[in-house]
């Protein structure tokens, strides 16, 4: 979990209940900052999840507030996290495969050096581009971050869908010469 805002954790109880209804038995590990995990547990507790019959094990792994290198190493991938600048404590992520492919996810953030560190040389940067409000990044700033990090492809996520697609893409392309896409349901990269 990158941070505790409703649009990022609000469906967690539904997700866990769905797994339980499907009779999951294998343990689930949820990673995040201490403050995020504490609030996530409070959210889950509203639904009495620990008392559901035959509930599968859930473990919470706290990511250090300063970030963590390779805090997940499983299934041919390594995941690292760094703090980014949002309205609440938030982490961005870097996923590296054993084959050398790299995807970075900024999460909700203002432009900051840690986004560039996470995305350094990445194949893909998933960069939020909600606009210039505090704690967020504009499409133009997303292009600047992608260029500074030397990524191959920029995918704008968490963007304002009231703004024309051509305007969003055009703003990012002013600053980044690589491929720029808008994230959409069922997008294959």
Model feature map: region roles:
Residues 110-189:
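Cap/insert and terminal regions of metallo-dependent hydrolase folds
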Residues 1-105, 169-189:
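Binuclear metal-dependent hydrolase catalytic cores
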């Amino acid at each position: 979990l990158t941070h505790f805002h409703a649009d990022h954790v609000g469906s967690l109880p539904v997700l866990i209940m769905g797994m339980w209804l499907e009779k999951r038995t294998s343990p689930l590990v949820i990673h995040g900052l201490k403050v995020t995990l504490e609030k996530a547990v409070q959210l889950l507790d509203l639904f009495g999840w620990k008392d559901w019959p035959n509930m599968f094990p859930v473990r919470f792994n706290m990511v250090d507030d300063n970030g963590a290198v390779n805090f997940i190493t499983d299934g041919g991938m390594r995941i690292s996290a760094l703090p980014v600048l949002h309205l609440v404590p938030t982490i961005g992520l870097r996923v590296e495969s054993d084959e050398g492919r790299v995807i970075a996810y900024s999460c909700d953030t203002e432009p900051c050096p840690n986004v560039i560190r996470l995305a350094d040389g990445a194949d893909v940067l998933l960069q939020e581009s909600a606009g210039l409000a505090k704690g967020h990044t504009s499409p133009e700033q997303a292009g600047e971050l992608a260029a500074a990090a030397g990524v191959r492809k920029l995918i704008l996520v968490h963007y304002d869908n009231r703004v024309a697609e051509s305007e969003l893409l055009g703003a990012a392309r002013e600053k980044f010469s690589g491929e720029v896409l808008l994230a959409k349901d069922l997008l294959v990269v």
